[in-house]
Curated annotation (Swiss-Prot):
Annotated GO biological process: adenine salvage; AMP salvage; purine ribonucleoside salvage
Protein name, as recorded: Adenine phosphoribosyltransferase
Keywords: Cytoplasm, Glycosyltransferase, Purine salvage, Transferase
Described function: Catalyzes a salvage reaction resulting in the formation of AMP, that is energically less costly than de novo synthesis.
Organism, as annotated: Acidothermus cellulolyticus (strain ATCC 43068 / DSM 8971 / 11B)
SUPFAM superfamilies referenced in this protein's UniProt entry, alphabetically: PRTase-like (SSF53271)
Amino acid sequence: MPPADIGELVAAHIRDIPDYPSPGIVFKDITPLLAEPAVFAAVVDALVRDYQHGTVDKVVGIEARGFIVAAPVAYHLGAGFVPMRKKGKLPYRTLETSYALEYGTATIEVHVDAFRPGDRVLVVDDVLATGGTAAAALELIDQASAKAVGLSFLIELSALGGRSRLPASMVRSLLRV
């Protein structure tokens, strides 16, 4: 599938769930996209396209839907996969940071040994909304003395301004709505 068509493909395979997880939020459900092997493969291919030349050592997936997309991206790039999880979900010593969400606040953690100093890290998540989660991921990567090289998202909710909280040159979204 040509890169110009990937946004249309993503748009055709997500559904809006109004008032979930709380009133006033329109949840972007990616399960229809994941259920179609050719569509899921095209999405993964599009996410790895800019990083295929050995520029990534680790791929971060942010709990929970980020895991689903980031793991195959890591596999295709020959990179390690690093889960960033909600507070209290990782069994070993962690680094942590708190941040604001579109619908509340949260804390994410990563194992203290998830990165080596200087690791080049790609962050992959399903949705860029306010940018709080992605900014928190960048903070944890920095705390670990690694270097973020990209932020890739399936969907960007442009009206929420998340891109403005992040290094704009690092942000790539397959679909901006």
